[in-house]
Amino acid sequence: MLADGYFTLSDGTRVGVAGDYVKANGVFQSFTSLCFRVPHELRFPDVSVLAELYSSGGSVVFVGPPSSGKTTALKSFASYLSERVDVVVADERHELSANNTADCDVIRGADKRYAFEVAVRSLSPQWVICDEVTNADLPYVCDCVNSGVNVACSVHGTSKEDIEKRFGDKFSCFTKAVILDKRHSVQVVDLQKSSTMTKSKEI
């Protein structure tokens, strides 16, 4: 983890690291600052949004800049889903499973390729939840969806147009996008119909 710029404490606190990185060895030679992201027992405020995402069917992507509430939304959605269906949480960075995922099957510390493969082949979920998907991860996400398993994940971004520009057709496997921002507004966008529902709620 440290070579990736962070490490995770036993309670789920993620500590980001800044300093002098030595590329050849893949380690930090010295540290200049640390950023602590302490997990809290928070819930996504509008259960009706979670209910809509579940009842409408299809995979969901939560989109927002850092600290916009993406991980909180995913945790709440995982908890909501786990009361209704079988859920696997692919927790690569040890953050998603810090709180309120007791009824989920959790794969911690594995990269998304391995976690998605194990989930589909061995755990029989209806949903897989993961955080911070990159362009390189999307083929594994789409393979999972094409296998008949819905996915809820997050990406860094600011709008539907932003993620479409950056990721193109790779996002075709998602049905809805939930756009979050630091002003605590929530937009649910139907990616198949381009319709938008806006809700202003504090996260």
Task: Give a label for each model feature.
Residues 1-57:
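P-loop NTP-binding catalytic core
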Residues 81-119:
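P-loop NTPase switch/communication element
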Residues 125, 130-191:
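Conserved P-loop NTPase nucleotide-binding/switch module
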Residues 66:
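The conserved Walker
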Residues 62:
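Hydrophobic anchor at the beta1->P-loop junction of P-loop NTPases
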Residues 10, 20-29, 180-203:
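Conserved P-loop NTPase
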Residues 69-70:
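Conserved glycine(s) of the Walker
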Residues 73, 77:
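Hydrophobic positions on the alpha1 helix immediately C-terminal to the Walker A/P-loop
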